[in-house]
């Protein structure tokens, strides 16, 4: 994780008078004693090298008469000499200058930021110098002492602040801190905070008021262009040996992106070093070698497609098998099987670290353009356990479910953006409505953090209304859902792109409608008409080549003019 190297200015050598040879001593001519040094006898000046330290981003310097000569960016490397009167004399392009009193020189970049107090604006865990999570959570409003940084960017800003929180040391990203306590404890109000404040904890996922809505820095990543509309084909990892068949479909239709499993619950894409370290059981179940998986992804990229790597986050039976201590358990500490699966608890930071490390490794090994986190939630249908007191989520920090989910995504986005990739999150279709769900997903809070948000409003997952069956009305169902999703988009400061999963399989409910190209077209049009214009992803669990081939007319014509 490092930041940019410290900036430097050009340096010029000091002009030092030449010391003449010492006169020869003779018996008749004793050496002359000199009580005061002169220019001829003064030793050469010893300039030291250091870095400009100041609380500001720049430091001014002056000539002997106090006239301003210019400014230096914090962290600039200079040659300097500390004078007896306390002034700091430096060498610059223009010659000798003197730093203003609010700046000084230190021996290492890590110390260029003077100690001062800041306040936690957004609750986050401290990190180590490599960006890995520490157990200490810095709560909103807490005072920390900034004692330095890990590195500087070219403009003198810190990559991470080195901080002390009540004797516990670590690092924090600067944007999670405020200069005053009042600013730190205030809630960001984009005109809709009162809306969030009125949405309490209805179903056990937490309230909306204590989530974070501060604007996040998003936008194009240099060298990585996300298509404005991702028309995306889903490919299960175990089908990558058929990559040529999927390319044929994409090349002859409007598809311009692929989403490929890195992990999908019990289906593991490849056995990586990170997985071997954290989850050897999962690595042993891998369906591809690293080399074969990478070759398939590279083939998609070489053909000009935007490629997304999908990770199932908090649904991981293999990880629980290897680490039952990180599981959601019964009161006796035994991993609890929920909906047929074992779940690591989303409250645990080791679980977070594993998933983010796995994502970073996937970017480095495979060159994905984006990482998508699916199952980024708590298990659903746990109300009966919670009511009976027969479930333990091991909530070490006293967080709500929604806080844990949003904070995980904040950490993941911070890390992955520095690796040059986008971050997306999958959410249940229910998440588009105006409450915090029981499993901790709240659309405005998640959309504010990630680059793309992908709801899963499959028509056959909606309840029937009398004789009206949503899966028989794909346009109306997705249009109505899309309007709700866009309403949530307007409730957050920096909303994500809305890129939606669509049903690309036959309905699983009576009368078991066949979903052909007309039904796919209807879903896509319903979303677009509702304002959800970021694209779609096809959900077909088997990634059936035959099914996708039959749906090609819905994907539109191949765009030979679009730069993919």
Question: Language-model segments: which ranges?
Answer:
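Beta-loop motif signature
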Residues: 40-86, 119-158, 197
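Boundary regions of SH3-family modules and the immediately adjacent low-complexity/disordered segments
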Residues: 16, 43-45, 91-119, 162-221
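An active-site-proximal structural segment forming one wall of the substrate-binding cleft
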Residues: 239-243, 248-253, 299, 342-376, ...
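Aromatic-lined carbohydrate-binding/catalytic grooves of carbohydrate-active enzymes
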Residues: 253-288, 380-388, 548
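Substrate-binding cleft of secreted/luminal carbohydrate-active enzymes
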Residues: 450-464, 473-479, 484-564
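Catalytic domains of carbohydrate-active enzymes, especially glycoside hydrolases
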Residues: 243-268, 363-370, 452, 527-535
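Active-site-adjacent "subsite" loops/lids of carbohydrate-active enzymes
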Residues: 221-238, 295-298, 309-361
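Aromatic-lined carbohydrate-recognition surfaces of secreted/lumenal glycan-active proteins
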Residues: 234, 306-316, 372-379, 399-439, ...
